[in-house]
Amino acid sequence: MSAPAEAGQRPVSTPVFRFKLNKVSAYGALNSLIVFRIIFLLKNPLFLMFTNKQKRKKTIRACTHCHRAHLLCDENRPCARCVQKGLQATCQDAPRKRKKYLLDVPPDSMQKQRYQSPEIKPEYPMNTLLPLPGQQIQRKSNFLSSAADMEYSTLSNILSENVHPFPNPSTSNEGTPNSITLSPALSPGTGGRTSTTYTAPTDIACDNALNQYVLGPTTTGISLYPDVVMAIETLKNTHPSVIHERNTRSTVSYAMGFMPDGNPHVSLPGGDYASVYAEPEDIYAKVRKPYSYTPGYHALIAYLRSRFPKQMLVKMAESMAAYRPSFIACTNALKEDDLIFMEQCFQRTLLTYDNFIKLSGTPTIVWRRTGEIAYVGDEFCVLTGWPKAELITQKKRLIVELLDDKSVVEYFELFSKIAFGDFLGATMTECTLLTSKPDVKIRTSCIWTLKRDVFGIPMMIIGNFLPI
């Protein structure tokens, strides 16, 4: 037996240990040799010359044969694959898939639109439309919404065969060009402003390519949505073929412009009733007492009793009973300063929405949780025909006065669900609006957005309406 190793000395290796160490060293040397040879081989020019394949570049547009076979094509015509297959004569670019809104447009008109300069040609005579008194056309070409302006311009340039950005005033008496809703700016403004205008024929202006009717001013008043709806109904009875031909292309749409002074806000007769306060400082300085909602509820109940039968009153009372006690319980726990702050929040939010609504171009109306109307957009007045001075006065008007019977019942049912159930409170529905003309009702698709204050109590409802 070997003597034990002294302290501090390296132990003597055994033969088994030496064998394993040599084996590991051999494997390490072999791996290093393999890696070295692989690197040398990859850097050898001869190896690269025989193994490197040229990457085929993808072309933007394949030919018809390669497109049908789902194979890569090149930019040459005929391409290499068609030359190999003997298809040189029929090798051409594959047609692109057309957009959905271009399916009804003939290809000839698209080619003509692409390579020829546009010119003005009347397509439909104006005598097929119902006359309206003294319509005026102005030179500016902007809509209330800049997004809608660009969208209408783009679609008209694509769909219309004859488009010109500025129609010649001398041709306005001969007919209606396809781009009449894009070129003139039509405004329901007051007649007190001076502007350079020229008079068009006393007919309804219509863009035949987009089936778009113009809501503009007249010498005797404002041409509003209910007027055009009545005119279209008469046109359906007198010239059904014209309406049928237009409806095959698109649904009816409406456009409204503004005065050429660059102000996107349209001033309707009766003054500016958009907001009582012009600056946020005025709100915090002048709002010194809370808003009383009790008279609003009393006025709402009195109006409902005078208009609806008992059966419908029961349904509305059931809906109101679901949220009215919650309102009372929430407000009873608040102090007077809290109630003043709630009214300041309401006016401040209304001032912010005033700027948004002026730029959106969507018919909008804002009312309190009691149904009292607090704000009316100009587009809503154009849509319904109601003057803004009549909707926003010292005597509070109610939103239920602008809805038909069925829509009023549905409104209370919907409001009872979103008042405290859904925190966001935004929902889309349909309703029927009553216009200033008793025999005209407008079916609309609307979005009701419930805005809450800092205490989580419903503060205002913003309604956006679009006719359907």
UniProtKB/Swiss-Prot annotation:
SMART domains hit by this protein: GAL4 (SM00066)
Domain PAS: 349-422
Presence of keyword Translocase: no
DNA-binding region per Swiss-Prot/TrEMBL record: 63-91
GO biological process, alphabetically ordered: carbon catabolite activation of transcription; carbon catabolite repression of transcription; cellular response to starvation; gluconeogenesis; positive regulation of gluconeogenesis; positive regulation of transcription by RNA polymerase II
Protein's UniProt keywords contain Lyase: no
Highest rank taxon of the organism: Eukaryota
Entry's Gene Ontology molecular function annotations: DNA-binding transcription repressor activity, RNA polymerase II-specific; RNA polymerase II transcription regulatory region sequence-specific DNA binding; zinc ion binding
UniProt-listed SUPFAM superfamilies: Zn2/Cys6 DNA-binding domain
Gene Ontology cellular component terms for the protein in this record: nucleus
Entry's localization field: Nucleus
Keywords, ordered alphabetically: Activator, DNA-binding, Gluconeogenesis, Metal-binding, Nucleus, Transcription, Transcription regulation, Zinc
Family: Belongs to the ERT1/acuK family.
Function: Transcription factor which regulates nonfermentable carbon utilization. Activator of gluconeogenetic genes.
Name of the protein: Transcription activator of gluconeogenesis ERT1
Organism (species): Meyerozyma guilliermondii (strain ATCC 6260 / CBS 566 / DSM 6381 / JCM 1539 / NBRC 10279 / NRRL Y-324)
High-level lineage: Eukaryota, Fungi, Dikarya, Ascomycota, Saccharomycotina
